[in-house]
């Protein structure tokens, strides 16, 4: 009479599981592009930001993504008025 044996082989190495980490976004290069006292041409980007961390002052416009840019050529001046940080462009 023949005996039938059921043999089950187990894995000698565990299967490699996936992780939920391992992603990162590209940096957005936010911040000041020109500093206080520098000369800016009309249309030059002064400050890239999300939200209005710094508000536009004289001769400074705000883009759709809250980027501050010079409306005319001149010297950049960062100032604080009424508890708000502002950036302005003044003629020489």
Swiss-Prot record:
PROSITE patterns: RIBOSOMAL_L27. GO terms for cellular component: cytosolic large ribosomal subunit. The keyword Ribosomal protein applies. Keywords: Ribonucleoprotein, Ribosomal protein. Residues 1-10 form a propeptide. SUPFAM superfamilies: Ribosomal L27 protein-like. The keyword Ribonucleoprotein applies. The N-terminus is cleaved by ribosomal processing cysteine protease Prp. GO terms for biological process: translation. GO terms for molecular function: structural constituent of ribosome. It comes from the Bacteria. Gene3D superfamilies: 2.40.50.100. PANTHER family: LARGE RIBOSOMAL SUBUNIT PROTEIN BL27M, RIBOSOMAL PROTEIN L27. Belongs to the bacterial ribosomal protein bL27 family. This is Large ribosomal subunit protein bL27. The gene is rpmA.
